């Protein structure tokens, strides 16, 4: 998904971010590669996501590099049992932190999980053509 967005020109430099709520069976498939780091506050509480894992882009990282150097561009995080803290368990090998939008992504994913378990992705892009339309079309909800 990150590479598709890059190839379509949806991301200027490090603009945009992505988060995916990982399925338990997918976590089991890769858990042997985890190396837990220190816990960090999320900045909000998402109790309905407690104990879950998420694949997220790194802050300031380029979508272009996700397929080239995934271990440096993205990370897998685990939430604690209260949904108040996270820790990186894989990725961002050269340092860094998850997207600065992590709290809002997790809050959205929590709402979507309560509505329908199938919703697992938050994708934020700066699509140039859509941005350009904001200068051409009237700024009305009905458009």
Label every PLM stretch briefly.
Residues 1-143:
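Glycine-rich flexible loops
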């Amino acid at each position: 998904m990150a590479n598709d967005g890059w190839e379509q020109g949806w991301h200027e430099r490090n603009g945009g971010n992505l988060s995916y709520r990982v399925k338990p069976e997918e976590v089991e498939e890769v858990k042997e590669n985890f190396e837990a780091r220190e816990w960090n506050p999320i900045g909000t509480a998402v109790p309905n996501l407690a104990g879950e894992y998420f694949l997220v882009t790194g802050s300031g990282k380029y979508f272009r590099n996700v397929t080239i150097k995934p271990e440096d561009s993205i990370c897998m995080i685990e939430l604690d049992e209260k949904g108040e803290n996270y820790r990186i368990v894989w990725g961002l090998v050269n340092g860094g932190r998850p997207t600065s939008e992590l709290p809002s992504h997790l809050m959205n994913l929590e709402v979507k999980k309560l509505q329908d378990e199938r919703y697992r992705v938050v994708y934020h892009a700066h699509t140039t053509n859509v941005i350009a339309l904001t200068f051409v079309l009237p700024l009305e909800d009905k458009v």
